[in-house]
């Protein structure tokens, strides 16, 4: 019964739109014309170039906000040894051997205090809140299970 009313209502709206002379937005004649004969879709900006989606060989992918100080606005409060720097080459696909999980393991092995200083380093050096929550869980899991 409800479905029938919804379908009938949809037909009524479609008929009203057809009768009012409304245009479809997907038609090419509705594009706004610009001076010089072009449209918004065809306008060329000589100073702007779109990236082709490829990176140079040997460069790491850095997620925006994945590392404190990545934008250059604030440096980390305390520097970590080079082997404990946060990774910059995560593929963000959720793989089981994630570089962030390895990073959490290295923090635990380095500090060996039950995870307190590892959690503090995590809070200080990782900017992404979702990633922090995941790594907090990993560190707590490792400290509880002894893993």
UniProtKB/Swiss-Prot annotation:
One GO cellular-component annotation of the UniProt record comes to:
mitochondrion
- Which parts of this chain are annotated as the region Disordered? 36-82
What stretches pass through the bilayer?
none
Q: What InterPro entries does the entry give?
A: Oxidoreductase-like_N, OXLD1
Residue span, Oxidoreductase-like domain? 81-108
Identify one Pfam family in the record: Oxidored-like
The biased composition feature labelled Basic and acidic residues covers 52-63
UniProt-recorded name of the protein:
Oxidoreductase-like domain-containing protein 1
What is the species of this protein? Homo sapiens
Starting at the broadest rank, the lineage of the source organism is: Eukaryota, Metazoa, Chordata, Craniata, Vertebrata
